[in-house]
Design a protein with these regions (language model features):
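C-terminal leucine-rich, beta-strand-based interaction scaffolds used for sensing/assembly
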Residues: 2, 14-23, 50, 403-560
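Long, basic/Gly/Ser/Thr-rich N-terminal segments
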Residues: 2-103
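The catalytic "switch" region of P-loop NTPases
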Residues: 18-24, 34, 38, 88-101, ...
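Charge-rich, solvent-exposed alpha-helical interaction surfaces
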Residues: 30, 34, 38, 50, ...
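Walker A/P-loop-proximal flanking segment of P-loop NTPase domains
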Residues: 58, 67-69, 76-186, 553-560
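Short linear interaction motifs
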Residues: 131-154, 265-268, 307-312, 348, ...
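P-loop NTPase nucleotide-binding core
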Residues: 132-134, 146-284, 289, 293-300
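Alpha-helix termini
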Residues: 142-147, 176-185, 273-276, 315-322, ...
Length: 560
Protein backbone atom coordinates (compact mmCIF):
# COMPACT_ATOMS: atom_id res chain seq x y z
CA UNK A 1 0.00 0.00 0.00
CA UNK A 2 1.23 3.49 -0.81
CA UNK A 3 2.95 2.45 -4.04
CA UNK A 4 3.54 5.45 -6.31
CA UNK A 5 1.63 4.39 -9.42
CA UNK A 6 2.85 5.73 -12.75
CA UNK A 7 2.08 4.86 -16.36
CA UNK A 8 4.92 2.31 -16.51
CA UNK A 9 4.52 0.81 -13.01
CA UNK A 10 4.28 -2.97 -13.16
CA UNK A 11 0.82 -3.68 -11.81
CA UNK A 12 -0.87 -7.07 -11.50
CA UNK A 13 -4.01 -7.86 -13.44
CA UNK A 14 -6.75 -9.04 -11.11
CA UNK A 15 -9.46 -11.18 -12.67
CA UNK A 16 -12.94 -11.10 -11.14
CA UNK A 17 -14.39 -14.37 -12.31
CA UNK A 18 -17.64 -16.25 -11.76
CA UNK A 19 -19.55 -13.16 -10.67
CA UNK A 20 -23.24 -14.08 -10.80
CA UNK A 21 -25.74 -11.90 -12.68
CA UNK A 22 -27.41 -11.05 -9.37
CA UNK A 23 -24.44 -8.81 -8.48
CA UNK A 24 -25.34 -5.15 -9.02
CA UNK A 25 -23.02 -2.65 -10.73
CA UNK A 26 -22.76 -0.90 -7.40
CA UNK A 27 -21.49 -4.05 -5.66
CA UNK A 28 -18.97 -4.71 -8.44
CA UNK A 29 -17.71 -1.12 -8.29
CA UNK A 30 -17.26 -1.37 -4.51
CA UNK A 31 -15.31 -4.59 -5.02
CA UNK A 32 -13.03 -2.96 -7.61
CA UNK A 33 -12.50 0.07 -5.37
CA UNK A 34 -11.53 -2.13 -2.42
CA UNK A 35 -8.94 -3.93 -4.56
CA UNK A 36 -7.44 -0.80 -6.16
CA UNK A 37 -7.20 0.96 -2.80
CA UNK A 38 -4.71 -1.71 -1.76
CA UNK A 39 -2.23 -0.11 -4.16
CA UNK A 40 -2.57 3.54 -3.31
CA UNK A 41 -3.73 5.26 -0.17
CA UNK A 42 -3.74 8.79 -1.62
CA UNK A 43 -5.27 9.00 -5.07
CA UNK A 44 -5.90 11.79 -7.53
CA UNK A 45 -8.11 11.61 -10.62
CA UNK A 46 -4.98 11.05 -12.69
CA UNK A 47 -3.62 8.19 -10.56
CA UNK A 48 -7.06 6.59 -10.24
CA UNK A 49 -7.18 6.49 -14.03
CA UNK A 50 -3.93 4.50 -14.13
CA UNK A 51 -5.63 1.78 -12.07
CA UNK A 52 -8.63 1.49 -14.42
CA UNK A 53 -7.31 -1.58 -16.25
CA UNK A 54 -6.01 -3.44 -13.21
CA UNK A 55 -9.25 -5.21 -12.27
CA UNK A 56 -10.86 -7.11 -15.16
CA UNK A 57 -14.30 -8.68 -14.91
CA UNK A 58 -14.59 -12.00 -16.73
CA UNK A 59 -18.00 -13.17 -17.93
CA UNK A 60 -19.75 -15.82 -15.85
CA UNK A 61 -19.40 -19.32 -17.32
CA UNK A 62 -21.42 -22.07 -15.64
CA UNK A 63 -19.41 -24.83 -17.39
CA UNK A 64 -16.33 -23.71 -15.46
CA UNK A 65 -17.89 -24.29 -12.04
CA UNK A 66 -16.88 -27.97 -11.73
CA UNK A 67 -13.49 -28.81 -13.23
CA UNK A 68 -11.61 -32.07 -12.77
CA UNK A 69 -8.49 -31.79 -14.93
CA UNK A 70 -6.22 -29.32 -16.73
CA UNK A 71 -7.33 -30.78 -20.06
CA UNK A 72 -10.96 -30.10 -19.17
CA UNK A 73 -10.07 -26.50 -18.25
CA UNK A 74 -8.44 -25.96 -21.67
CA UNK A 75 -11.37 -27.58 -23.43
CA UNK A 76 -13.94 -25.53 -21.50
CA UNK A 77 -12.08 -22.25 -22.05
CA UNK A 78 -11.80 -22.72 -25.81
CA UNK A 79 -13.92 -20.15 -27.62
CA UNK A 80 -15.20 -18.56 -24.41
CA UNK A 81 -15.33 -14.81 -23.80
CA UNK A 82 -13.12 -15.45 -20.77
CA UNK A 83 -10.40 -16.88 -23.02
CA UNK A 84 -10.48 -13.87 -25.36
CA UNK A 85 -10.42 -11.42 -22.43
CA UNK A 86 -7.29 -13.04 -21.02
CA UNK A 87 -5.70 -13.35 -24.48
CA UNK A 88 -6.17 -9.62 -25.12
CA UNK A 89 -4.48 -8.69 -21.83
CA UNK A 90 -1.56 -11.07 -22.32
CA UNK A 91 -0.97 -9.92 -25.91
CA UNK A 92 -0.41 -6.29 -24.96
CA UNK A 93 2.56 -7.28 -22.78
CA UNK A 94 4.21 -9.76 -25.12
CA UNK A 95 3.67 -8.27 -28.57
CA UNK A 96 6.05 -5.73 -30.06
CA UNK A 97 5.25 -2.24 -28.84
CA UNK A 98 3.36 -0.74 -31.80
CA UNK A 99 3.81 2.76 -30.36
CA UNK A 100 7.41 2.63 -31.66
CA UNK A 101 6.24 2.12 -35.24
CA UNK A 102 6.57 5.03 -37.66
CA UNK A 103 3.30 5.37 -39.58
CA UNK A 104 3.11 9.15 -39.45
CA UNK A 105 6.50 10.91 -39.44
CA UNK A 106 6.92 14.20 -37.59
CA UNK A 107 6.72 16.32 -40.75
CA UNK A 108 3.27 14.81 -41.55
CA UNK A 109 1.82 15.41 -38.09
CA UNK A 110 0.87 19.10 -38.43
CA UNK A 111 -0.49 18.55 -41.96
CA UNK A 112 -2.77 15.69 -40.86
CA UNK A 113 -4.00 17.61 -37.81
CA UNK A 114 -4.95 20.61 -39.96
CA UNK A 115 -6.84 18.43 -42.46
CA UNK A 116 -8.87 16.79 -39.68
CA UNK A 117 -9.46 20.12 -37.93
CA UNK A 118 -10.69 21.86 -41.09
CA UNK A 119 -12.99 18.98 -42.06
CA UNK A 120 -14.47 18.78 -38.53
CA UNK A 121 -15.29 22.50 -38.55
CA UNK A 122 -17.01 22.04 -41.93
CA UNK A 123 -19.21 19.24 -40.53
CA UNK A 124 -20.80 21.10 -37.64
CA UNK A 125 -24.28 21.93 -38.98
CA UNK A 126 -27.06 19.36 -39.35
CA UNK A 127 -28.08 20.34 -42.89
CA UNK A 128 -24.65 19.78 -44.44
CA UNK A 129 -23.47 17.14 -42.00
CA UNK A 130 -22.63 14.18 -44.22
CA UNK A 131 -21.68 12.25 -41.09
CA UNK A 132 -25.36 11.82 -40.25
CA UNK A 133 -25.88 9.85 -43.47
CA UNK A 134 -23.46 7.19 -42.29
CA UNK A 135 -25.12 6.81 -38.91
CA UNK A 136 -28.76 6.97 -40.00
CA UNK A 137 -28.41 4.03 -42.39
CA UNK A 138 -30.22 1.57 -40.09
CA UNK A 139 -33.32 3.60 -39.07
CA UNK A 140 -33.80 4.80 -42.67
CA UNK A 141 -33.65 1.19 -43.94
CA UNK A 142 -36.12 0.17 -41.22
CA UNK A 143 -38.56 2.91 -42.24
CA UNK A 144 -38.43 1.99 -45.92
CA UNK A 145 -38.81 -1.74 -45.29
CA UNK A 146 -41.77 -1.26 -42.96
CA UNK A 147 -43.59 1.08 -45.35
CA UNK A 148 -42.51 -0.27 -48.73
CA UNK A 149 -46.10 -0.82 -49.91
CA UNK A 150 -47.85 2.05 -48.14
CA UNK A 151 -47.27 5.62 -47.03
CA UNK A 152 -45.52 5.93 -43.64
CA UNK A 153 -47.40 6.84 -40.46
CA UNK A 154 -44.80 7.12 -37.72
CA UNK A 155 -43.00 9.12 -35.04
CA UNK A 156 -39.23 9.57 -35.48
CA UNK A 157 -37.79 10.22 -32.03
CA UNK A 158 -34.28 11.39 -31.23
CA UNK A 159 -32.34 13.71 -28.97
CA UNK A 160 -31.31 17.17 -30.13
CA UNK A 161 -28.53 16.71 -32.66
CA UNK A 162 -29.38 13.09 -33.44
CA UNK A 163 -30.08 13.75 -37.12
CA UNK A 164 -33.81 14.56 -37.24
CA UNK A 165 -33.28 17.72 -39.29
CA UNK A 166 -30.87 15.89 -41.59
CA UNK A 167 -33.44 13.17 -42.31
CA UNK A 168 -36.19 15.78 -42.76
CA UNK A 169 -34.01 17.52 -45.38
CA UNK A 170 -33.34 14.21 -47.15
CA UNK A 171 -37.10 13.67 -47.47
CA UNK A 172 -37.61 17.20 -48.81
CA UNK A 173 -34.86 16.69 -51.39
CA UNK A 174 -36.52 13.55 -52.80
CA UNK A 175 -40.00 15.20 -52.74
CA UNK A 176 -41.94 11.93 -52.46
CA UNK A 177 -41.83 8.70 -50.47
CA UNK A 178 -41.42 6.24 -53.35
CA UNK A 179 -38.38 8.03 -54.77
CA UNK A 180 -36.83 8.32 -51.30
CA UNK A 181 -37.20 4.57 -50.68
CA UNK A 182 -36.08 3.53 -54.18
CA UNK A 183 -32.77 5.31 -53.61
CA UNK A 184 -32.28 3.37 -50.38
CA UNK A 185 -33.21 0.05 -52.02
CA UNK A 186 -33.27 -0.26 -55.82
CA UNK A 187 -35.88 -3.06 -55.60
CA UNK A 188 -38.53 -0.66 -54.30
CA UNK A 189 -41.16 0.98 -56.52
CA UNK A 190 -39.62 4.09 -58.10
CA UNK A 191 -42.89 5.49 -59.50
CA UNK A 192 -43.60 8.95 -58.06
CA UNK A 193 -46.13 8.90 -55.20
CA UNK A 194 -46.44 9.71 -51.51
CA UNK A 195 -45.75 13.42 -52.08
CA UNK A 196 -44.30 15.27 -49.10
CA UNK A 197 -45.92 18.40 -47.66
CA UNK A 198 -43.98 20.21 -44.88
CA UNK A 199 -46.81 21.13 -42.47
CA UNK A 200 -44.33 22.35 -39.84
CA UNK A 201 -40.57 22.85 -40.17
CA UNK A 202 -37.69 24.22 -38.14
CA UNK A 203 -37.48 28.01 -38.33
CA UNK A 204 -33.82 28.17 -37.30
CA UNK A 205 -32.16 27.36 -40.60
CA UNK A 206 -31.73 29.40 -43.76
CA UNK A 207 -30.34 26.41 -45.67
CA UNK A 208 -33.59 24.44 -45.44
CA UNK A 209 -35.77 27.17 -47.03
CA UNK A 210 -34.98 26.40 -50.71
CA UNK A 211 -35.73 22.70 -50.08
CA UNK A 212 -39.07 23.60 -48.49
CA UNK A 213 -40.06 25.82 -51.43
CA UNK A 214 -39.10 23.21 -54.04
CA UNK A 215 -40.95 20.46 -52.18
CA UNK A 216 -44.13 22.58 -51.89
CA UNK A 217 -43.94 23.49 -55.59
CA UNK A 218 -43.67 19.81 -56.53
CA UNK A 219 -46.58 18.95 -54.21
CA UNK A 220 -48.83 21.55 -55.89
CA UNK A 221 -47.76 20.37 -59.35
CA UNK A 222 -48.41 16.68 -58.63
CA UNK A 223 -51.75 16.97 -56.77
CA UNK A 224 -54.42 18.51 -59.02
CA UNK A 225 -56.51 20.05 -56.24
CA UNK A 226 -53.58 21.13 -54.02
CA UNK A 227 -53.08 24.81 -53.29
CA UNK A 228 -50.44 24.82 -50.55
CA UNK A 229 -48.97 28.20 -49.68
CA UNK A 230 -45.23 28.58 -50.18
CA UNK A 231 -45.17 29.70 -46.53
CA UNK A 232 -47.55 26.99 -45.25
CA UNK A 233 -45.13 25.82 -42.54
CA UNK A 234 -44.74 29.41 -41.25
CA UNK A 235 -48.52 29.99 -41.24
CA UNK A 236 -49.05 26.76 -39.31
CA UNK A 237 -46.34 27.61 -36.77
CA UNK A 238 -48.13 30.91 -36.13
CA UNK A 239 -51.50 29.15 -35.65
CA UNK A 240 -49.92 26.70 -33.19
CA UNK A 241 -48.19 29.49 -31.26
CA UNK A 242 -51.57 31.26 -30.81
CA UNK A 243 -53.26 28.16 -29.40
CA UNK A 244 -50.40 26.48 -27.51
CA UNK A 245 -51.61 27.58 -24.06
CA UNK A 246 -55.35 27.27 -24.71
CA UNK A 247 -57.48 24.30 -23.66
CA UNK A 248 -58.91 23.51 -27.09
CA UNK A 249 -60.05 20.44 -29.02
CA UNK A 250 -56.61 19.37 -30.25
CA UNK A 251 -57.98 16.62 -32.51
CA UNK A 252 -59.96 19.23 -34.39
CA UNK A 253 -57.03 21.68 -34.41
CA UNK A 254 -54.60 19.20 -36.00
CA UNK A 255 -57.20 18.00 -38.52
CA UNK A 256 -57.83 21.58 -39.66
CA UNK A 257 -54.09 22.32 -39.87
CA UNK A 258 -53.54 19.25 -42.06
CA UNK A 259 -56.42 19.69 -44.51
CA UNK A 260 -56.10 23.49 -44.84
CA UNK A 261 -52.39 23.04 -45.57
CA UNK A 262 -53.33 21.11 -48.72
CA UNK A 263 -56.27 23.29 -49.72
CA UNK A 264 -58.00 26.01 -47.65
CA UNK A 265 -61.44 25.01 -48.97
CA UNK A 266 -61.21 21.50 -47.52
CA UNK A 267 -62.75 20.82 -44.12
CA UNK A 268 -61.93 17.23 -43.12
CA UNK A 269 -59.41 14.40 -43.48
CA UNK A 270 -62.11 12.21 -44.96
CA UNK A 271 -62.74 14.79 -47.74
CA UNK A 272 -58.98 14.97 -48.38
CA UNK A 273 -58.63 11.18 -48.50
CA UNK A 274 -61.53 10.84 -50.95
CA UNK A 275 -60.04 13.47 -53.27
CA UNK A 276 -56.69 11.66 -53.20
CA UNK A 277 -58.42 8.35 -53.95
CA UNK A 278 -60.11 9.83 -57.02
CA UNK A 279 -56.77 11.26 -58.22
CA UNK A 280 -54.92 8.02 -57.40
CA UNK A 281 -52.41 9.99 -55.36
CA UNK A 282 -50.96 9.62 -51.89
CA UNK A 283 -49.39 12.27 -49.66
CA UNK A 284 -47.15 12.32 -46.58
CA UNK A 285 -47.44 15.21 -44.11
CA UNK A 286 -44.15 16.17 -42.42
CA UNK A 287 -43.84 17.77 -38.97
CA UNK A 288 -40.61 19.06 -37.43
CA UNK A 289 -39.64 21.96 -35.14
CA UNK A 290 -42.30 21.43 -32.46
CA UNK A 291 -39.72 22.21 -29.74
CA UNK A 292 -39.33 25.75 -31.11
CA UNK A 293 -43.02 26.50 -30.48
CA UNK A 294 -43.99 24.25 -27.56
CA UNK A 295 -41.23 25.25 -25.14
CA UNK A 296 -43.02 24.46 -21.86
CA UNK A 297 -43.98 20.81 -22.34
CA UNK A 298 -42.54 19.61 -18.97
CA UNK A 299 -44.78 22.01 -17.02
CA UNK A 300 -47.72 22.77 -19.35
CA UNK A 301 -50.60 20.28 -19.38
CA UNK A 302 -52.00 22.00 -22.48
CA UNK A 303 -48.79 21.59 -24.48
CA UNK A 304 -48.48 18.00 -23.29
CA UNK A 305 -51.99 17.36 -24.59
CA UNK A 306 -51.19 19.01 -27.94
CA UNK A 307 -48.34 16.54 -28.52
CA UNK A 308 -50.10 13.50 -27.05
CA UNK A 309 -53.17 14.02 -29.26
CA UNK A 310 -50.98 14.50 -32.34
CA UNK A 311 -48.77 11.45 -31.72
CA UNK A 312 -51.53 9.13 -30.54
CA UNK A 313 -55.06 10.30 -31.40
CA UNK A 314 -54.43 11.89 -34.80
CA UNK A 315 -51.77 9.40 -35.88
CA UNK A 316 -53.92 6.39 -34.93
CA UNK A 317 -56.98 7.87 -36.68
CA UNK A 318 -55.07 8.44 -39.93
CA UNK A 319 -53.57 4.95 -39.72
CA UNK A 320 -56.98 3.30 -39.24
CA UNK A 321 -59.13 5.32 -41.65
CA UNK A 322 -57.16 7.10 -44.38
CA UNK A 323 -54.95 4.94 -46.59
CA UNK A 324 -53.91 7.80 -48.89
CA UNK A 325 -52.57 10.05 -46.13
CA UNK A 326 -49.21 9.48 -44.45
CA UNK A 327 -47.69 11.32 -41.49
CA UNK A 328 -44.10 11.55 -40.20
CA UNK A 329 -43.65 13.41 -36.91
CA UNK A 330 -40.08 14.30 -35.92
CA UNK A 331 -40.07 14.63 -32.15
CA UNK A 332 -37.39 15.26 -29.58
CA UNK A 333 -37.25 12.32 -27.14
CA UNK A 334 -37.60 14.39 -23.96
CA UNK A 335 -40.75 16.07 -25.33
CA UNK A 336 -42.31 12.69 -26.09
CA UNK A 337 -41.47 11.43 -22.61
CA UNK A 338 -43.01 14.49 -20.95
CA UNK A 339 -46.12 14.54 -23.15
CA UNK A 340 -46.97 10.82 -23.25
CA UNK A 341 -47.68 10.42 -19.54
CA UNK A 342 -49.41 7.03 -19.80
CA UNK A 343 -47.51 4.00 -21.16
CA UNK A 344 -44.60 6.01 -22.55
CA UNK A 345 -42.35 2.92 -22.71
CA UNK A 346 -44.95 1.13 -24.83
CA UNK A 347 -45.17 4.20 -27.10
CA UNK A 348 -41.39 4.33 -27.42
CA UNK A 349 -41.21 0.62 -28.22
CA UNK A 350 -43.91 0.96 -30.90
CA UNK A 351 -41.72 3.39 -32.85
CA UNK A 352 -38.31 2.03 -31.83
CA UNK A 353 -37.58 0.94 -35.43
CA UNK A 354 -37.31 4.62 -36.41
CA UNK A 355 -35.58 5.98 -33.30
CA UNK A 356 -32.44 8.00 -34.04
CA UNK A 357 -30.18 6.74 -31.30
CA UNK A 358 -26.60 5.90 -32.10
CA UNK A 359 -24.61 3.23 -30.33
CA UNK A 360 -21.01 3.61 -29.22
CA UNK A 361 -19.98 1.35 -32.13
CA UNK A 362 -21.58 3.73 -34.62
CA UNK A 363 -19.92 6.71 -32.94
CA UNK A 364 -16.51 5.06 -33.31
CA UNK A 365 -17.27 4.33 -36.97
CA UNK A 366 -18.00 8.03 -37.36
CA UNK A 367 -14.50 8.87 -36.10
CA UNK A 368 -12.99 6.62 -38.78
CA UNK A 369 -15.35 8.09 -41.41
CA UNK A 370 -14.33 11.64 -40.43
CA UNK A 371 -10.60 10.95 -40.65
CA UNK A 372 -11.01 9.07 -43.94
CA UNK A 373 -12.81 12.05 -45.48
CA UNK A 374 -10.23 14.47 -44.12
CA UNK A 375 -7.20 12.35 -45.04
CA UNK A 376 -7.76 10.73 -48.44
CA UNK A 377 -6.81 7.06 -48.56
CA UNK A 378 -6.78 6.60 -44.78
CA UNK A 379 -9.34 3.75 -44.87
CA UNK A 380 -8.16 0.99 -47.21
CA UNK A 381 -10.64 -1.88 -46.73
CA UNK A 382 -12.97 -3.21 -49.44
CA UNK A 383 -15.92 -3.33 -47.01
CA UNK A 384 -17.57 0.05 -46.35
CA UNK A 385 -17.05 1.73 -42.97
CA UNK A 386 -20.72 1.35 -41.98
CA UNK A 387 -20.54 -2.42 -42.63
CA UNK A 388 -17.06 -2.98 -41.17
CA UNK A 389 -16.57 -5.27 -38.16
CA UNK A 390 -15.53 -3.99 -34.73
CA UNK A 391 -12.12 -5.57 -35.29
CA UNK A 392 -11.55 -3.61 -38.51
CA UNK A 393 -12.78 -0.34 -36.98
CA UNK A 394 -10.56 -0.97 -33.93
CA UNK A 395 -7.51 -1.28 -36.18
CA UNK A 396 -8.15 2.15 -37.70
CA UNK A 397 -8.99 3.76 -34.36
CA UNK A 398 -5.53 2.75 -33.16
CA UNK A 399 -4.11 4.69 -36.11
CA UNK A 400 -6.17 7.72 -35.08
CA UNK A 401 -5.58 7.86 -31.30
CA UNK A 402 -3.64 4.73 -30.35
CA UNK A 403 -4.64 1.64 -28.38
CA UNK A 404 -4.06 3.48 -25.11
CA UNK A 405 -3.41 7.08 -24.08
CA UNK A 406 0.27 6.22 -23.94
CA UNK A 407 2.30 3.14 -24.85
CA UNK A 408 0.24 0.06 -25.65
CA UNK A 409 1.77 -1.83 -22.70
CA UNK A 410 1.36 1.03 -20.20
CA UNK A 411 -1.19 1.45 -17.40
CA UNK A 412 -2.87 4.27 -19.33
CA UNK A 413 -6.56 4.10 -20.23
CA UNK A 414 -7.72 2.38 -23.42
CA UNK A 415 -8.21 5.36 -25.74
CA UNK A 416 -11.56 4.42 -27.29
CA UNK A 417 -13.15 3.59 -23.93
CA UNK A 418 -11.80 6.81 -22.41
CA UNK A 419 -13.23 8.90 -25.26
CA UNK A 420 -16.64 7.17 -25.17
CA UNK A 421 -16.89 7.68 -21.40
CA UNK A 422 -15.78 11.30 -21.77
CA UNK A 423 -18.44 12.18 -24.36
CA UNK A 424 -21.49 10.05 -23.42
CA UNK A 425 -24.37 10.85 -21.09
CA UNK A 426 -26.10 8.41 -18.72
CA UNK A 427 -28.71 7.54 -21.37
CA UNK A 428 -26.00 6.20 -23.63
CA UNK A 429 -26.56 9.12 -26.00
CA UNK A 430 -23.55 10.10 -28.06
CA UNK A 431 -24.38 12.55 -30.82
CA UNK A 432 -22.57 12.98 -34.11
CA UNK A 433 -21.66 16.54 -33.22
CA UNK A 434 -20.00 15.32 -29.98
CA UNK A 435 -17.55 13.18 -31.97
CA UNK A 436 -17.12 15.87 -34.62
CA UNK A 437 -16.42 18.52 -31.99
CA UNK A 438 -14.02 16.20 -30.16
CA UNK A 439 -12.00 15.70 -33.36
CA UNK A 440 -12.09 19.45 -33.99
CA UNK A 441 -10.49 20.19 -30.60
CA UNK A 442 -8.23 17.11 -30.45
CA UNK A 443 -6.70 18.11 -33.79
CA UNK A 444 -5.47 21.46 -32.45
CA UNK A 445 -1.69 21.09 -32.32
CA UNK A 446 0.11 21.83 -29.07
CA UNK A 447 3.19 22.78 -31.07
CA UNK A 448 5.35 20.10 -29.49
CA UNK A 449 7.20 17.23 -31.08
CA UNK A 450 4.85 14.21 -31.17
CA UNK A 451 5.94 11.46 -28.74
CA UNK A 452 4.47 8.71 -30.94
CA UNK A 453 4.51 8.11 -34.70
CA UNK A 454 1.99 5.24 -34.77
CA UNK A 455 -1.05 7.53 -34.44
CA UNK A 456 -2.32 10.93 -35.57
CA UNK A 457 -3.75 12.31 -32.31
CA UNK A 458 -1.40 12.41 -29.32
CA UNK A 459 -2.60 11.58 -25.77
CA UNK A 460 -2.13 15.18 -24.60
CA UNK A 461 -4.23 16.46 -27.52
CA UNK A 462 -6.96 13.92 -26.74
CA UNK A 463 -7.05 14.89 -23.05
CA UNK A 464 -6.94 18.63 -23.73
CA UNK A 465 -9.97 18.36 -26.03
CA UNK A 466 -12.35 17.29 -23.25
CA UNK A 467 -12.66 20.59 -21.27
CA UNK A 468 -13.40 22.45 -24.53
CA UNK A 469 -16.00 19.83 -25.53
CA UNK A 470 -17.56 20.12 -22.08
CA UNK A 471 -17.87 23.91 -22.27
CA UNK A 472 -19.44 23.74 -25.73
CA UNK A 473 -21.85 21.01 -24.62
CA UNK A 474 -23.14 23.07 -21.70
CA UNK A 475 -23.55 26.16 -23.90
CA UNK A 476 -25.64 24.08 -26.31
CA UNK A 477 -27.76 22.54 -23.55
CA UNK A 478 -28.55 25.97 -22.09
CA UNK A 479 -29.44 27.34 -25.54
CA UNK A 480 -31.55 24.36 -26.68
CA UNK A 481 -33.24 23.13 -23.48
CA UNK A 482 -34.98 26.07 -21.83
CA UNK A 483 -36.04 23.98 -18.82
CA UNK A 484 -32.46 22.82 -18.10
CA UNK A 485 -30.82 26.24 -18.38
CA UNK A 486 -31.60 27.44 -14.79
CA UNK A 487 -30.46 24.07 -13.38
CA UNK A 488 -27.07 24.36 -15.08
CA UNK A 489 -26.72 27.97 -13.96
CA UNK A 490 -27.45 26.86 -10.39
CA UNK A 491 -24.74 24.17 -10.60
CA UNK A 492 -22.28 26.65 -12.13
CA UNK A 493 -22.86 29.09 -9.27
CA UNK A 494 -22.37 26.58 -6.43
CA UNK A 495 -19.45 27.25 -4.11
CA UNK A 496 -16.35 25.17 -4.83
CA UNK A 497 -16.82 23.30 -1.54
CA UNK A 498 -20.14 21.92 -2.84
CA UNK A 499 -18.81 21.00 -6.28
CA UNK A 500 -17.92 17.41 -5.48
CA UNK A 501 -19.17 14.03 -6.66
CA UNK A 502 -21.13 12.25 -5.53
CA UNK A 503 -23.58 14.95 -4.50
CA UNK A 504 -25.73 14.02 -1.53
CA UNK A 505 -29.46 14.10 -2.27
CA UNK A 506 -30.32 15.25 1.24
CA UNK A 507 -28.22 18.41 0.76
CA UNK A 508 -31.09 19.72 -1.38
CA UNK A 509 -28.94 21.02 -4.24
CA UNK A 510 -31.78 20.25 -6.67
CA UNK A 511 -35.55 20.19 -6.32
CA UNK A 512 -37.43 16.98 -7.14
CA UNK A 513 -38.51 18.43 -10.52
CA UNK A 514 -34.97 19.56 -11.38
CA UNK A 515 -33.64 16.13 -10.50
CA UNK A 516 -36.30 14.47 -12.68
CA UNK A 517 -35.48 16.69 -15.68
CA UNK A 518 -31.73 16.10 -15.36
CA UNK A 519 -32.14 12.32 -15.03
CA UNK A 520 -34.52 12.27 -18.01
CA UNK A 521 -31.99 14.15 -20.14
CA UNK A 522 -29.15 11.79 -19.12
CA UNK A 523 -27.15 14.43 -17.23
CA UNK A 524 -27.70 13.01 -13.74
CA UNK A 525 -28.00 9.58 -12.20
CA UNK A 526 -29.04 8.69 -8.68
CA UNK A 527 -27.61 5.76 -6.77
CA UNK A 528 -29.38 5.63 -3.42
CA UNK A 529 -28.77 9.03 -1.82
CA UNK A 530 -25.77 9.73 -4.06
CA UNK A 531 -26.03 11.67 -7.32
CA UNK A 532 -23.48 11.74 -10.15
CA UNK A 533 -22.84 13.86 -13.26
CA UNK A 534 -21.38 12.45 -16.51
CA UNK A 535 -17.87 13.47 -17.60
CA UNK A 536 -19.12 15.55 -20.54
CA UNK A 537 -20.66 18.16 -18.21
CA UNK A 538 -18.62 17.63 -15.03
CA UNK A 539 -15.50 19.31 -16.41
CA UNK A 540 -17.04 22.64 -17.42
CA UNK A 541 -19.11 22.81 -14.23
CA UNK A 542 -15.94 22.39 -12.17
CA UNK A 543 -16.99 19.34 -10.13
CA UNK A 544 -14.28 17.12 -8.66
CA UNK A 545 -14.46 13.49 -7.60
CA UNK A 546 -14.30 12.31 -4.05
CA UNK A 547 -12.39 9.09 -3.46
CA UNK A 548 -13.95 6.13 -5.27
CA UNK A 549 -16.54 8.18 -7.19
CA UNK A 550 -14.79 8.11 -10.57
CA UNK A 551 -14.95 4.31 -11.11
CA UNK A 552 -18.67 4.42 -10.31
CA UNK A 553 -19.30 7.10 -12.94
CA UNK A 554 -17.27 5.19 -15.56
CA UNK A 555 -19.15 1.95 -14.92
CA UNK A 556 -22.46 3.79 -15.39
CA UNK A 557 -21.29 5.51 -18.59
CA UNK A 558 -19.77 2.43 -20.22
CA UNK A 559 -22.58 -0.02 -19.43
CA UNK A 560 -24.33 1.18 -22.62
Amino acid sequence: KGLCVQSDTLLPTIFLSMIPDSFSEREKTELRTTLTECFQSKTTERTEELLDNMVVELPFASELVHLTSFQQILSSLNGRDMYYSIEKIVEQYYQADESKAILYPEEMHEILLKKIHDFAINQTTAEKNGAAELLLTEPIKNLCLRYRNQVPITVVQGAKGSGKTFLYCRLLEKKNWNIFCSEINKKFDSEDNGYFLPVLATQNSEEIKPLLSQCIDEFNRAIDFADASVAVYIDNAYKLSLEKDNDIDWMKFWEQIFVSSVNKNMTSLSELDEALQINKKKIVLLIDGLEEILQSVPSSKTQQKAIAVLCQGVLNTISAKYENIGLIIFLRSDMAQNAITVNYEQFKQTFSYAELKWSSNEALKLAVWMVDHAVKGFYEESVSIENASQEVIGKYLEKIWGLKLGKSNSNEAYASNWILAALSDFNGQLQARDIIRFLEFASISNGKKPPYYDRILMPSEVRNALPNCSRKKISEIKAEYENLKPIFEKLENLSSSKKKLPMNAEDGIMTAMEEKLMIQAGYLIRDGEKMYLPEIIRHALGFRYEKGARPRVLSLLLKH
